[in-house]
Amino acid sequence: MGISLSGIGTVGKEQLISSCSNGEPNWSYIPTKGKSSKTHAEFVSEIKELARRAATIANKTEYEYISRQVLGLRAEYLSDVAPDRKQLYEQAKNTIKKQTGNSKCKGCGELSLLDFLEKTEGKSSNFAEKKFALAGGGTLNCPILTTGGYGAEIQYQGVTVLSNLGNGWGYEMTPAELAKKDEFYSIYWSEYNLVKESGSSELREMPDYLNQDRPSFEARA
């Protein structure tokens, strides 16, 4: 699993890059439709609990651990408005698998979309110019990367909801997700600031690791 950032400061775009070791998107951090059945009250309770823990962290190692938990919980929180990225990804993978014409690949669920894209190299000189329609209502583009080979961009309702251009899987948020994200962090930062402001003098003097790294955290968040 890997998580990194790119394009910090880009307005309206989610810059989280999250991939599993096998090249698949890491769905623990990438929102997709129907991930959770928690009630709103349960979400609020968990968000506030993480905020309280974050407000009292003692070092950056703890901060990194908590920030990952925040990103995971946020992915769940957005699931009721998120597009079905997981289904779109599987449809894209199946579409490209058919392009390989390699029967040995059939049923190889452990292979990622990029694995199948790699198998298309040399099979079609205009492959990057094609736009594949997906059953879920999205489209798949496969741009040629400067490093060689193909990348993948899955678009849905005008938004690039999932992409990999050589550095891992990232995504942009839909307008509904952006609104839900703001709602999530309104709860989070209100509780975080409340704990900081109402804490003991010792707590208020504690290094504020989240505020020190807040631009980075908010880009990741």
Which role fits each region the language model picked out?
Residues 1-221:
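Type III/flagellar secretion export determinants
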